[in-house]
Amino acid sequence: MEFRKNDLVTLEIEDCGIDGEGIGKADGFTVFVKDAVIGDTVTAKIIKAKKNYGYGRLMEVLKPSPYRVEPKCEFARQCGGCQLQALSYEQQLVFKTNKVKGHLERIGGFTDIPMEPIIGMDELFHYRNKAQFPVGRNKEGKIVTGFYAGRTHNIIENRDCALGVAENKEVLDRVIAHMEKYGIEPYNEATGKGLVRHVLIRYGYFTKEVMVCLILNGNKIPKEELLVKSLCEIPGMTSITINVNKKHSNVILGEEIRLLWGQEYITDRIGDISYQISPLSFYQVNPMQTQKLYAKALEYADLHGQETVWDLYCGIGTISLFLAQKAKFVRGVEIVPAAIENAKENAKLNGLENTEFFVGKAEEVLPREYKKNGVYADVIVVDPPRKGCDETLLETMVEMNPDRIVYVSCDSATLARDLKYLCERGYELRKVCPVDQFGMTVHVETVVGLQRKDT
């Protein structure tokens, strides 16, 4: 049977796609349905039809799955932030485990994978210490802020995200009220006009410090002293800055930071290590789970106090300083100059003198230091962005021949690709542990321990 756009089909959802969508079949025709849960029987409308598969919109749940739960957030289906709120948390962990395992098998070609049980979350909501809220106008002309609907730049108005902290709403209420009172225009992506693009909020989970950064299509916000006074009424307010981004693009942050009040950073803690975090810093958004993630990375590194460690894609030194507590010496590499300045300050803040940090691309710095300066490593730790490691970097890692490699990944597909490269060149998979950093979403972190085969 041939299916066309707008056809209605009844499906039993038998599987789950990597983006959390339910998968069912009608007369052999596979349909991917957002918001459907494995075990559901649903009616879906075909919104896109290919030869052997299509995409459907959930119209009605005829028989709910035993794994289906009521989403906590009323915007769960509209917003692009949470893909799994309708799925029980136990099944979310099963989904994420299978996602990692499936990528390692299909892309990496691994069998008999030494998987440890996924490390789940205790607090499923209000765990995010950072949020970026776009600002715009709705169809009625009202200034709104919230999150983008899935696969669009249409703002779903929501100042109180279920994954964020309560301080987010307090900040946004004051910023929007200030804009309305003084006629300040939100940015319009289509025209490139307007002033306020985004509001970035960071929160120190352990210190309770609050940071507000206004991303502007300009240098100054009108009546800024009155806005600062209003924001300072929020308990914990520590840093108020402006980020200037005049580019006509959808890139959120520019490079220029201007301090309005307080200091340019907040401080937070993971384990025994304190970190200074600036508006541009990369810092894990779930500090409770990050502590577990880094503890697992430290376990896999198996440090005894005599090792030289390279930490690639080190950010503000989050993993580096964890490692420095146990290693003889740690060298970190990060492409963002401001992050390296933060890393150096964080090392001083924690009294760790056995560290050195380099600015540059990991795939350029490591080969240079190895080939020109003869550096070596007992252990290499990598925590790359979603695209994974550059092959030049992997090649140098293999040439350096460290005893152990620890790979921390936010994308199990590129992880599998890179592990295949390393394991074809003298390393073996010793341990794999998924860590749920992002409950209610499809994202999962993975820590992998690799050992050189001749040891």
What kind of feature is each model-predicted range?
Residues 2-10, 18, 223-234, 238-455:
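Rossmann-like S-adenosyl-L-methionine
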Residues 45-49, 134-138, 202-206, 453:
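Short beta-strand micro-motifs enriched in acidic
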Residues 24, 39, 82, 199, ...:
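Residue-level signal for inorganic ion chemistry
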Residues 59-71, 77-186, 206, 221:
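Extended interfacial segments that mediate partner engagement and assembly in macromolecular machines
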Residues 116-124, 189-190, 197-198, 202, ...:
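Short, solvent-exposed loop/turn elements at beta->coil junctions and helix N-caps
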Residues 22-27, 146-149, 213-215, 343:
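Short, acidic/hydrophobic/Gly-rich beta-strand patch recurrent on exposed beta strands
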